[in-house]
């Protein structure tokens, strides 16, 4: 997949971070900052999903929010996915009660 569209979208964000943001007082209530979040979201998730995540974050960042640590979510395809497995399938360990039932105790 080409990274050119992602880089084209991230370029204005980097310009803002380098030239405009240093002239403004710190205002973002989140870590990472909204501009860093937007750049990371686009690079991680692609242009469309990344911009949607960035817009959602900007709508949450206002004077009445608590703020705090809010990282970019991991890509949907990350993890221990098995080809052909359903997206909602999760592995789990048997409980002690299930083990005792299966062993006839």
From Swiss-Prot:
NCBIfam families: membrane protein insertion efficiency factor YidD (TIGR00278). GO terms for cellular component: plasma membrane. Could be involved in insertion of integral membrane proteins into the membrane. It is found in: Cell inner membrane. It comes from Nitratidesulfovibrio vulgaris (strain DSM 19637 / Miyazaki F). It is a peripheral membrane protein. Belongs to the UPF0161 family. The keyword Chaperone does not apply. Keywords: Cell inner membrane, Cell membrane, Membrane. Its main location: membrane. Pfam families: YidD (PF01809). This is Putative membrane protein insertion efficiency factor. The keyword Nucleus does not apply.
């Amino acid at each position: 997949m080409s990274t050119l569209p992602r880089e084209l979208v991230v370029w204005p964000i980097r310009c803002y971070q380098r030239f405009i943001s240093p002239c403004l007082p710190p205002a973002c209530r989140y870590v990472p900052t909204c501009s860093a979040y937007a750049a990371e979201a686009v690079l991680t998730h692609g242009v469309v999903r990344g911009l949607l995540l960035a817009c959602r974050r900007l709508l949450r960042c206002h004077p009445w929010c608590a703020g705090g640590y809010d990282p970019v979510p991991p890509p949907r395809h990350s993890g221990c996915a098995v080809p052909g497995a359903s997206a909602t399938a999760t592995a789990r360990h048997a409980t002690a009660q299930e083990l005792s039932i299966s062993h006839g105790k």
